[in-house]
């Protein structure tokens, strides 16, 4: 099984998502975060399941519609490790901090 490492900024992404969910969907917000983390756990067994993105990055599509998110990650086969770099809502326009 592959190892999964979350970049420190992923915590900020999850905080932002949770804040948005509490504002718009209330009590159901924590279950969205559980769904996101459960989907990321799939990468332990299937690190190449995400669609190819730019360069050596991949995107894992999580859920759909209002519950839709995208996790940007890099799989390093030599280390058998998945590095999750960012998470955003499908309606968000890109990975802001990744575009520099």
Q: Which stretches of residues belong to each language-model region?
A:
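Basic, Lys/Arg-enriched alpha-helical interface segments
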Residues: 1-59, 64, 78
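Enriched for short, Lys/Arg-rich terminal
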Residues: 21, 67-100
């Amino acid at each position: 099984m592959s190892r999964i490492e979350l970049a420190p900024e992923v915590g900020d992404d999850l905080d932002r998502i949770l804040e948005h969910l509490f504002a718009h969907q209330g009590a159901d917000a924590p279950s969205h975060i559980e769904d996101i983390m459960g989907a990321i756990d799939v990468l332990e067994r299937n690190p190449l399941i995400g669609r190819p993105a730019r360069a050596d990055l991949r995107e894992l599509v999580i859920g759909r519609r209002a519950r839709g998110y995208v996790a940007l990650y890099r799989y390093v086969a030599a280390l058998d490790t998945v590095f999750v770099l960012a998470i955003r809502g499908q309606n968000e326009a890109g990975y802001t901090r990744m575009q520099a």
